[in-house]
Amino acid sequence: MGCNDKCGCAVPCPGGTGCRCTSARSDAAAGEHTTCGCGEHCGCNPCACGREGTPSGRANRRANCSCGAACNCASCGSTTA
């Protein structure tokens, strides 16, 4: 899977393998856990301006991540609150 806005990587992708999603097992109980090579969890929005782990009233939520209050990047602006 190539780099995209669901991996927490820079958009547009700078290239290389740093923005490719991979599956890794953290432990047997947790099962498959998908992470991105740049350190973010796939499914979270890629805002560099901050995230909130719980719903904040902003409509743009992915995999339990939502845009921080100060976010105005394209991913956060893709939906309206």
Swiss-Prot record:
This chain's source organism reads Triticum aestivum
An example Pfam family from this entry, by short name, is Metallothio_PEC
Q: Which family does it belong to?
A: Belongs to the metallothionein superfamily. Type 15 family.
Q: Output this protein's name.
A: EC protein III
PANTHER family in UniProt? EC PROTEIN HOMOLOG (PTHR48198), METALLOTHIONEIN-LIKE PROTEIN 4A-RELATED (PTHR48198:SF1)
Q: GO molecular function, one example?
A: zinc ion binding
InterPro entries xref list: Metallthion_15
| Role summary | Binds 5 molecules of zinc. May have a role in Zn(2+) homeostasis during embryogenesis.
Which superkingdom does the taxonomy of this entry point to? Eukaryota
Q: Which residues cross the membrane?
A: none
